[in-house]
């Protein structure tokens, strides 16, 4: 179920009008079959694609009243709660999800993000450390921790994590500029330019890095 929901939301190829039409049809079907959880999950998906966070949250809540361990509903309700800035509720949903399925990177990173928004920096750091330990081959795990460390001005730690992320995804331009940004904050322009040159050698288009080359002058 959770995998199917990720695929569906990731595709999101329909136009807004098509999503609105889907909502209308699904409302009629739910009125006929109010106990059908699949229909409610489909409607919530459409609501999310229309950025109707409250409607989506309410559908996931209806699902969870019937099936309190429904992973798709827990995960995506947490996402909706985050969009609605209801961070404590989002945290509770992520924690409930992870209690059932602890080895889920996106949920762990979602929880870390919410903890940051709640001002719980130590807890957020612990969660990011846990993500890296559990997923040592994940670019996203290292990048998330590096972004947090950069925000906290922990630049040496951030550089290590940006390097680890780049080791796993050497042709990712966003990772390159993130590392370069930290080097420039430290006044290490020569190293920043060398990092850009290395990225170009790896196959990243130099034009995409022009702004950062200018900052290295």
Model features per residue range: what roles?
Residues 17-22, 181, 185-217:
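Terminal, low-structured helical/coil segments at or just beyond the last alpha-helical repeat
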Residues 1-8:
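Bacterial N-terminal signal peptides
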Residues 10-54, 58:
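N-terminal leader/linker segments that initiate helical-solenoid repeat arrays
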Residues 37-38, 71-72, 105-106, 139-140, ...:
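Helix-start (N-cap) detector for alpha-helical repeat units in TPR-like alpha-solenoids
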Residues 16-25, 51-62, 83-96, 118-130, ...:
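Structural signature of tandem alpha-helical TPR/SEL1-like repeats
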Residues 48, 75-82, 116, 143, ...:
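Position-specific recognition of the canonical hydrophobic site in helix A of tetratricopeptide repeat
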